[in-house]
Structure formats: structure tokens, C-alpha cells
Amino acid sequence: MNSAYHSPDMSQRIPGPAYSSSAPPPPIHTYQQHQHPPPPLPPPSQHHHSSHPPLPPPPSAPHPHHQHPPPPPPSHSLSSHQHHSQPPHHQSQLPPYAPAPYQQPQPSQYPRPHPHQQHAPSPSQHDEPPPPPPFSGPSPTDHQKDSEYVPPSYSKIEEGSGWKYSLDVKQQPVRARMCGFGDKDRRPITPPPCVRLVIINTETGKEVDYNSLDHAMFVLSVDLWNHDGTKEVNLVRSSTGTGAMASSSTYTYSSLEPGTPSYQQQSLPPSRESGYGQSQGLNYGQDYPPPVQQSYGQAPSYPPSSSYGPPQQYYPRHSGYSAEPSAPPPGAPFRNGYGQDQNALTRMAVVGGQPQGMFTRNLIGSLAASAFRLEDTEGQSGIWFVLQDLSVRTEGTFRLRFSFVNVGRPGGQGTNVNQGRAPILSSCYSESFHVYSAKKFPGVCESTPLSKKFANQGIKIPIRKDANIKGEGDEEMYDQN
């Protein structure tokens, strides 16, 4: 009886602990399915004997969990497992862990299981940086190639003779000191550009005999271009009327062509009659004539203290100017270059003492050169153009463009001059050179062997003395030959 009585008790006790041990799993699964109530239950499930006492805290614990239902279920399952792993070590700290789920910035705790997921995207992030290095590598080299780009040269076969002309710049310009807008202080480009003319007979494919060639009608012209060789900058306009240039801006001849009719409008009588009285209200002084206003409308106004004084002499009486619109203007005021033709204005721009805002040449000096038969440093005879008298008014980086023209008759001999148009048979650009201000100018270049060779043959090239090579004295010590 007793054994039979104990058997049911043991059967009841055995299932009891078994049921108690099996009871925790259902709440775990229910916790995984239902996110709100379970958090307090799992810790008691792990502690078999303490499962009943911690039941009072659960009512307070579910509230934080009710506050944090938004996180995804897998995250709660992970957090639940973490809570299951933490409480066994601290049984008395179950209530403090209740706020811990409230601080579910458990990204700090999640990275422990997720490091594998974080390391997975990291290679993708490390895969992105590799593309930039190859892209950044060639880019600077490409920019350098673009900066070193030299415009292509041009050559043409002359009709009648069948000769092909080309230019070869043997001596490139390097640097120069800006000469400003005065005509007294001239600073030539150093070293002087030396261009060799190459003539090839298309029938034989060889160069012609330069010793028997008549080069009297060969002319080389020069103009100034920007650093890239994409735009000519032959004209410059100063923003001040003083000798020292405060600022300047370069222009091209083509950019001024649309404004040419404004020069012809100067001589219209109606503009003079009404324009002179209105000029006072247009920030022009009473002593300044309207033709200047019309032809240089974009220029800043002339201050009363300006050194531009000729109009004061040409227009002593204001009433006389408006009463006789035709007589005074063609007489006095236009004799200094304010003529009706555009060429007079161009000549006036070259002459010094111009008012502020007037256009003038940026490249000055001998802009055309005749050909010479000279021997180079190797003793070979050839046709050369030496441009030793070139100066630039403004500071910057420029190029020179050389254009060759044969002004003689095609196929003619002697001094037959072409009365028509002479086509450009060849052109080329020099390398870029820099024009420095007076303070930044490092000094003139030393005389090259080619310059000395040409100077010994009678070409007037400034040759630097040997005593000045070491820097003694100033740069004006030359042998002009």
C-alpha cells in the first residue's frame, strides 16, 4: 500500500518538476510570439526556484516593454536571449534590468551577434574606395597635358612656285618685364624669338638652296595670344589715366568690330548739338567733348583732375560748340586723332598720353620683321626672322603667333610687288612665356649662343655683358652691336 501510495506521489512529483521544467519553454515560445508580457517570465524560467518570487516585478516590467513594441520581433528575440543570459549571474538585479530594455539602444549589445553582418557590408564599403585612386591618378596628368597643349601650326603650298613654307621657332621667348602704358620704358622679351623659315620643293621633297633664294619679299608678322592659344589679346584698356597701371583688361580686334559704327557717329551734327549739353549729366566734365563720350561709352567717366587736357584748349566756349556743330569739330578737336576714320583712332591708341579707358596695343615694338640670310651655331645657312624689339604692356602669361607672308608676286622675280592680297603661307605659335611686374621680375635671360651668333653677323640683338652675368649691376648693361 505504501509503495503503491508512493508510486502515485512520485508519479505526481515526477511530472510536477517535469511540468515545471517543461512549463518554462511554453512561455519562451509565447514570448517569442507575443512580445509584451514575456520579458519578466523568461528570467524566472531559467531560475527554477526563483520563478515565483520575481512575479511581483513583472507588472512594472511589462510597461517598459509596452513602451518599446516598435522594434522588430527578431531583435526582441535576441534581446530576450541576452536577458536570459544576463540574469543568471545577477538574480537580485532583475528590477534594474527592467529599465535596461527601456534603453534598448541595444545596438551596443546587438553588434555582438551582428558583427558578422557588419563585417559583411564593410567589404562593400571597402570596395568603393578603390575606384577613386585610379580616377584621381590620371586626372592631374591630363590637366598637365592640357596645360602644355600647343596650338597646331599651319603651312600652305604657294601657287605658282609649288613650294611649301613652314616656320620653326628655334629660340623661344621665356620671360619679360611689363612696360606699362608709357613709351619711354621699353622692356624687350628675352631671349629674342628667332624663327627659321623652312621651304620645301614639293617636286623633289627637299629643301631649296637658301643661298640662291631671293628673300627680299618675305615678311613675318607677330601678334599676341592668350596662354591657351585660343584668343588673341592684342588690345588692352587701362582703368586709370595715370602712368602706373592699376588694372587692365585685354580685348581682340574682332570684339570691337560691332562697335565701329560708334566712331562714325561722332561727326553727326545732331549728336553734337544735343550731346554736348547732355554730357554734363552723364558724369563727363564740362570741358570734355561728346565725341569721346560716344566713341568710348564703356569707359569710366573722366575725373575733373585728370591729366587729359586737350579738349579744354579745343573747346574754350561751350556756346560756340553747340552753335557751330560742323566747323570746330573737324578742325581742332579731331586733328589729334579723333578723326572719322577708324585708322586714326588706332593710331591715336598707339601714341602715349591717351585718356583713361582708351584702347591701345598690348604687344608693342616691331611687330613685323624682314627675312635675313644667316648662319646658325652649326654653320648652316638659312632664312631667319629675328624679333628683338617686342614688349608687352601688361602682366600675364601669353603666346606669340607668327605668320609668314610673301608680298612678292607668286612665281615672280626681282622686286615685283603683289598689288592684291597676299595669303598667309605659314603660321605657328611660340611656347608660353610669362610677363612679370617690376617687383616680381627675376631679371633678363642670359644671352644665348644663337643670339651671340646673329649679333656677330650684324643683327642688332641686345647682348648681355659677361660682367653682368653674375648679377652685378642692373639689366641695362648691354652691347647693342
UniProtKB/Swiss-Prot annotation:
Organism annotation: Fusarium oxysporum f. sp. lycopersici (strain 4287 / CBS 123668 / FGSC 9935 / NRRL 34936)
Name of protein: Velvet complex subunit B
InterPro entries noted in UniProt: Velvet, Velvet_dom, Velvet_dom_sf
Family indicated by similarity: Belongs to the velvet family. VelB subfamily.
Ranges annotated as biased composition (Pro residues): 36-45, 53-62, 96-112
Record function comment: Component of the velvet transcription factor complex that controls sexual/asexual developmental ratio in response to light, promoting sexual development in the darkness while stimulating asexual sporulation under illumination. The velvet complex acts as a global regulator for secondary metabolite gene expression. Component of the velB-VosA heterodimeric complex that plays a dual role in activating genes associated with spore maturation and repressing certain development-associated genes.
Gene Ontology biological process terms in this record: sporulation resulting in formation of a cellular spore
Chain positions covered by the region annotation Disordered: 1-157, 241-339
Domain of life: Eukaryota
Phylogenetic placement of the source organism: Eukaryota, Fungi, Dikarya, Ascomycota, Pezizomycotina
